[in-house]
A protein has these predicted regions:
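Periplasmic-binding protein-like
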Residues: 149-158, 256-276
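A bilobed periplasmic-binding-protein/Venus flytrap-type ligand-binding module shared by bacterial periplasmic
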Residues: 121-132, 234-246
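A conserved helix-loop-strand patch within extracytoplasmic ligand-binding domains
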Residues: 114-163, 262
C-alpha cells in the first residue's frame, strides 16, 4: 500500500512537471509571436557591383530588425517587372535614363527612383588592340542593344574620336544617327550582359562596367577609353510608387548613403565605380 502511494505521488509529480514544461514552452512561443518580428525586404540586383554593395548594408539593417534578401538578376528586364509585380520590394541595377525609357515602353509599370548611389563609367575594351588609336578601318564594334545604353555607347565612341553623331540626339542616338564614320566601323548590337563574350570576335566592344567586372575585366586597367567622372548615368534604387516612405525603404536608403558604403566603393573598385553621394 505504501509502495502504491509513493508510486502515485511520483507519477503525479512527473505529470505536473511535464505539464509545466509544456506550458512554459507554449508561453515562450506566444511571447515570440507577440514580440517584435523581423521585417524582410527583398531587393533585386545585378551580381556586380550592386549585390556586393548591398551586402555591405546588411549588418546595419539587421540592427534595425530588417532582414535584407538579395535576389540576383543577370538581365535588364526582369528586375523592373518583378518589382512592379511585388515579387521583390526594390531593385538596384539601372540608371535613370534606362528607367525612363523602360517605363515609356511599359507604361503599365508604376516605379519610382528614390536614390542615386554610384556611377559606373562605361568603357571601350578590346582583346586585339592596346590603344584606341589602333582601331583599324572596317573594325567591328559591339555595343549594347538596349536604346539608352546603345546611345550612351555611341556617345562614348564619338568622344573617343571614332565617329560623329547627328547634332542634339544625345543618349537617344542610334546607329542611324552616325553622320560621319571615317573608319567605316561595323556595328553589332548585342544584349549588354553578353558583350564581354564578343571580345574575341570583334575589334572593340563598348561595355557597361558591371558586366565588364563580372567578366573579370578591370576598367581602370583594361579599358582603352572610359567615360569621365561627370557621367550622368547614376545607378539608382527603384521601388514601386507609393512605397517611397515605407520604413524599410527609408532605412535601406539611409544605409546605402553611409560612409561604410562610400568607403567600400572607393577601396574595392578603385575608381572603376564612383560614389554619387
Amino acid at each position: 500500500m505504501i509502495f502504491k502511494e509513493v508510486f502515485m505521488k511520483k507519477l503525479l509529480t512527473l505529470v505536473l512537471a511535464l505539464t509545466t514544461l509544456a506550458l512554459v514552452g507554449c508561453g515562450g512561443g506566444a511571447d515570440n509571436a507577440g514580440g517584435k518580428s523581423e521585417k524582410v525586404i527583398k531587393v533585386g540586383a545585378s551580381p556586380v557591383p550592386h549585390a556586393e554593395i548591398l551586402e555591405v548594408v546588411k549588418p546595419e539593417l539587421a540592427k534595425e530588425g530588417i532582414k535584407l534578401e538579395i535576389v540576383e538578376f543577370n538581365d535588364y528586364v526582369q528586375p523592373n517587372l518583378a518589382t512592379n509585380d511585388k515579387e521583390i520590394d526594390a531593385n538596384f541595377f539601372q540608371h535613370e535614363p534606362y528607367l525612363k525609357n523602360f517605363v515609356t515602353e511599359h507604361p503599365e509599370l508604376k516605379l519610382a527612383n528614390v536614390l542615386g548611389v554610384h556611377v559606373e563609367p562605361m568603357g571601350i575594351y578590346s582583346h586585339k588592340i592596346k590603344n584606341i588609336n589602333e582601331v583599324k578601318d572596317g573594325a567591328q564594334v559591339s555595343i549594347p542593344s538596349d536604346p539608352t545604353n546603345g546611345g550612351r555607347a555611341l556617345l562614348l565612341l564619338e568622344r573617343a574620336g571614332l565617329l560623329k553623331l547627328k547634332g542634339g540626339v544625345g543618349a537617344a542616338a542610334t546607329v542611324q544617327d552616325v553622320v560621319d564614320n571615317p573608319k567605316k566601323l561595323q556595328f553589332k548590337e548585342i544584349e549588354a550582359p553578353q558583350l564581354p563574350r564578343t571580345l574575341d570576335d570583334v575589334d572593340i566592344s563598348v561595355i557597361n562596367t558591371n558586366w565588364a567586372m563580372q567578366a573579370d575585366l578591370v576598367p581602370t586597367r583594361d579599358a582603352l577609353f572610359m567615360e569621365d567622372k561627370t557621367s550622368p548615368y547614376v545607378n539608382i534604387l527603384v521601388v514601386r510608387q507609393g512605397d517611397e516612405n515605407r520604413p524599410e525603404i527609408q532605412a535601406l536608403m539611409k544605409a546605402l548613403h553611409s560612409e561604410a558604403v562610400k568607403n567600400f566603393i572607393n577601396e574595392k573598385y578603385k575608381g572603376a565605380i564612383i560614389p554619387a553621394f
